[in-house]
A protein has these predicted regions:
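C-terminal and inter-domain tail/linker signature
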Residues: 1-132
Length: 132
């Protein structure tokens, strides 16, 4: 399994509340600044943030941008569905995550989220339903 496949599999399980693979691939000293919350997050913080936000988000297709022994770059698409909260239509974003490794474990990562004014599933060969 590649680093990208392992990363995606770990977080897909995490989105469902199973963080066992996440725990195995992250370094105990992992830290990351979370721009959504404004905090320097450790792994436990990331789990809480993910669990909370996943209630209104669908994480779609992932694509590997770059992978080496010490670095992974991945892109994914996100559908944010606030209809149950405020009745609004879903919106979409593209995320790029840079993942840094130390001794084979994830030590740091940064995610940049870019809003989209279109539904990416209409332009690519996948459907949101495949990821819900």
């Amino acid at each position: 399994m590649t680093k990208a496949e392992e990363y995606v599999a770990a977080w897909r399980l995490g989105y469902r509340g199973d963080f066992s693979l996440v725990d195995r691939i992250y370094h105990p000293d992992y830290k990351s600044f979370d721009y959504r919350t404004g905090i320097e997050a450790n792994l436990e913080d990331d789990k809480v943030i993910t669990s909370t936000l996943n209630a209104v988000m669908t994480i779609g297709h992932f694509q590997t941008i770059y992978e080496s022994e010490d670095f992974l770059g991945v892109e994914c698409f996100v559908k944010r569905n606030y209809a149950e909260i405020d009745g609004s239509d879903p919106d979409y974003a593209a995320r790029i995550t840079a993942v840094h490794y130390e001794n084979g474990k994830i030590i740091a990562q940064k995610t940049s989220t870019n809003p989209l004014d279109f539904d990416p599933s209409e332009y690519f060969e996948w459907k949101w339903e495949d990821f819900e």
